[in-house]
Amino acid sequence: MEEIIFWMEDAADSGVKKIADKVAGDVELVTDRRPRVLYGTSQEELADVAERAETVIVPATVGKSRLLEQMEEEKRIGLEQIRGKRECYGWFFLNDPEWHGTQILLIAGSDKRGTIYGLFHLSELLGVSPFVDWCGIRPPHREHVGLRASMACVAGEPSVRYRGFFINDEWPAFGTWCNRRFGGFGTSVYEHVFELLLRLKGNYLWPAMWSARFGDDGPGLANAKLADEYGIIMGMSHHEPCLRQGEEYKYLRGKDSVYGDAWNFRTNREGIIRFWKDGLLRRGKFENVITLGMRGEADTAILGEKATLEDNIELLRDVLKTQNELIRECVDEDVKRVPRMLALYKEVEAFFYGNDQTAGLMGAEELEDVILLLCDDNYGNLRTLPTKEMRTHKGGYGMYYHLDYHGWPISYEWINSSYLPKIWEQMTTAYEFGVRELWIVNVGDIATQEFPLSYFLDMAYDFGRWGSGAVNQTAEYTRQWTRQQFGSFTEEIQEQIADVLQGYTRLIQKRRPEAMRAMVYHPVHGRETQDTLEEIKRILTEAERVYAWVKEHAPEYEAAFVALIYYPAAGTLNLTRMHLLAGMNQYLAKLGALHANDYGDAVEQCLKRDRELVTAYHQMDHGRWDGMGASEHIGFVHWNEDECLNPVIHRVLPADKPRLVVTVDQTMQHAEGSPWLTESMKLPDFLDPACRSAGITLYGLSECEAAYEVTEKPEWLSVWPMQGVLDGKKHNYEKLELVINRERWAMNRDGNTGTSACGVLEIKTPSGCCRIEIPVCENLPEVPEGTFVDTAGYIVMEAEHYADRKDGYAADGKREGKNEKVRFQCIRDYGKTRSAMKAFPVTAYGVPGENAPYLEYHFWVSKPGGYVLTLYMQPSNPVANDQKLCYGVQNNGGEIRIYNAVPEGYRIGDQGEFWAKGVLDQIRRQEIPVSCRSGINCLRIYSVTPGFVLEKLLIRP
């Protein structure tokens, strides 16, 4: 007797039949036995099949299955939980005597996609990855499928109606890959794309469009027909209306063309209307979300710079009216039944809102039932969101989000550089503001974006599991995702893979690969470069260790592991390391240090390694990803790859006599000891009472032997080594470790009072003697726990290190239920250094002093007077069209001052320099004057408008 047989009605949708066959293939991958897929028309035939199997799996769709109707009539099942719903499914186990003791698993879908998701639920339970086809991941082996009645379930409606991705910026990577593997952009490639989308519980796709023509490349309409068969809802990109792509117009236009030769609704109105009409006639019969509106060719503004806002709005209003009439004529007389979308992308956002002088399109009759697709700023930060009043819009709202971008200030397209906590923080905000109708994410070439894409679509499908209630759950998601892909690996290896994923994405999102260059991280200050290099080494070592384990213990997973984990991690970290080393090379070259050449050699090795990684990726698994790594990614000097540069390295020629330079670690101070240059250096580390050790580094400047010796030091300080020789060849630098004995220092200090006392360190060099003053913090005040003390001339406080936190409540009129509690919560591992604080619920507005929540920080300074407070914030954008992203500051119970985190005239996008710096650095800084008293000060930071995310505070004179 067979363990499993799939049985389906002959009348079932062909797409469901194809998916059932794929799931049967999944069962074969797990058990090495492929179940048969049989068809019939009646319960009698089902009973006959039941004699031959332990379990018969019966997929069926409500409204398209006579079998479901009969079983419901006979009271064997109840479909009330799924009937009339969208994309729901139920698993019903039946064990009637007429089926000879055989277990029947009835997978009932509320519609085609519901049935498909129900089928793929079996694959999930068997440990089959959604990337089984895309990446070739084999599931763990099992002897039996082991279906049990306890697995019965009903899956509710997905949280977001339309959920999908956009294949974009596809040249040179995705396009090259398509041509080499599939001969173009036809059904042979979209077969895999559609399967991937459905396995990820998506339902909506924008196809490749730089050079592709989805409606022609199938060949012909084959792509569209295949999408319809699988239940994929198609759309065109944000600037391709009426089911026509920009490349189609390029291909069809001409002086003798019926479509004219100008993408201009004023001068070529009839030609453009004909072009749109033919697109609707060709593809309007399929399931689509039709893009409305009109932008310029190649993703540009439709009218020139001289056009007024009113000109643009009136043109767009005319376009929308015309398009709705065409849809009514060509698709459905009741245009309200046709899903339509207008993307408020870039300049179109301004046309929607208008200004004080010109009314925008908000509330326009032409948009009454149209989905309004809002957008991020192309760097993962949301732009405007619906106000409470706007959320009544019948068509609902969508969000166009980016994991890939081709545009100013710098493109990022090569490898995933997006971070899950960022996606969570932004997309939960979108959902809570009512953006629930459509989520579409730009995934570029798809390859290497599998991890964040999974998270995006899982959140869209089940917001209750991964949305607002899942604060600080991205690490858990990462572990689950790792288990989903590599379930046969040991738990220890799975944990290490999850650590690599979290580690590299957190580090890379701080500065994306294409935007990375020498000196982005300071070579010495705050150990920025050193700490980052050490973190890269840690992650790469772990990745290499796991890779070695995979090759030895699970070689059949090597290709998938490389594609999903190793290549993205190693590629991006190696690139970042290369630029960090280039920065060290340039810094040391300015000192004349021969050690700069070692860094230069290391840069060259990184560049070589970059080429090796891309080549190996292309060759892996018989060329499975050939072409996918082709995007330029090193040293962008413009927004795109034009004139991009490999790192510039400096070669230092040796001096012709013994010379060395003494540097104080973490500072730019250096000296050779010349008697003509007698200014002392200072080592400030021991001003921090928690500091026990510090460093001084000596670099050789010549290939002649250069001796040094510590000739004077405080007795409370140990130095090692005390002397040595640099030869400029095998030994061209020396690190001296300085360790303080604070007990001995306290016993031997001279009795002076104050904040610090100094020791002196002298180092004899070939050029003379270097003198280094070493101040030490003393007489620290006794302060309450949680109080920061100024010992080094500044105070740094992570946002999560508050002394007190006070809850507030939502301001009247801004959120339903004004007495709802609002409080700051910590988002762990989010931000440049440690974490971030944000007020929840995210839609709440606050009035400082009345209802706004606040964070309170305590700090001690020795001198009263004016200080500068620098706030480090996420580079968020205002959620409303008022250009306000506000917070309040209060020091020592004084006046609460309100500040806007963005300047007047704030501009997102092209030539918005303030915005650009924020998104490239992944941080926004704002300096504020504060008046402090001697002793303990109390600083409060209030949340005023949604979107304020605080990471760190710096106070200095």
Name each model feature, range by range.
Residues R138-E143, T478-F636, P853-L855, M873:
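C-terminal non-catalytic alpha-helical accessory regions
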Residues M1-G156:
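Contiguous, structured surface segment used for ligand recognition
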Residues L198, N203-W206, D216, L374-G380, ...:
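Structured mid-domain segments that build the active-site/substrate or prosthetic-cofactor binding neighborhood
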Residues H633, V637-L701:
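Beta-sheet-dominated interaction scaffolds and their linkers
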Residues P689-P957:
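Extracytoplasmic
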